[in-house]
Amino acid sequence: LFIFVSGYLFYLTRIERPMPYLRMIGDKLKRLGIPFLVFTMIAMVIKTRFAEDMTRPSSIGLQEFVHNILYPGEGPLSELWFLTAIGWMFILRPLWTWSLNGKYATAATVALLTAIHLYAPKGIEFLALSSAMRYVLFFYLGMIACKYRIVDRFAVAYKTILVIAGSIYVASIFLDFALLSALSGIALSVSLALLADRFVPQLFAGFRNYTYQIYLISIFVQVLVKILYKHDLITHYATGYVVCILAGIYVPVLIAATAKKLNIRFINLCLGLSK
């Protein structure tokens, strides 16, 4: 879903309203690369200091740092594979621009990316290549959804789509069909978002502009909650679970909003803030 949304936003901001290619690459390198390096180093320090509380402890050293950059899925913050994988997708903007100019080229690209998703080799951890090949289909579908205003069409019949997508999603679990599960899950999530927007339009207002910062920071907050629970400072699992979710959302939002207000360029770059 995150990859799909990224593709949607990429088309909206970098294809529909294009900027020069090299400038776009430089912008994405800053927005993805600097937080990637910073949060990798932070994770290495924390996981070394609290090694006894970590499922996957780390160590500090130049060789370890280089390995974590080249093999992000094996690093102390394995979730950062996403930044490397999506970086590959941004680099391919000329291909996306060309293929989206014609329906036959678009259909052929979808077919090719579907084949890559289903049959690409797994286990290539170097620069998250396997992950990039596996998820690029959803990135492209996100761009298609933006180009053809598919979400707007969903809004007309979101209740029907909600029922159909939900039924297909449940069926796909029993059928063990991962691609069908992913596609129906995306449709289900979009329908639920449209439902929420219809009845509770301000539900996501508090953090809608900070989803990237939630992604970057939330894991550290959740690790802290887990450490507190492990040392009996949070005594009930249910309490810890709720605190983990809420803190994982709103602590990053608080940090990002404060940084945005201070408007210190270095901090903004480290947190991936656009300004």
Residue ranges and their predicted role:
Residues L1-K275:
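Alpha-helical transmembrane segments and their immediate juxtamembrane cytosolic regions
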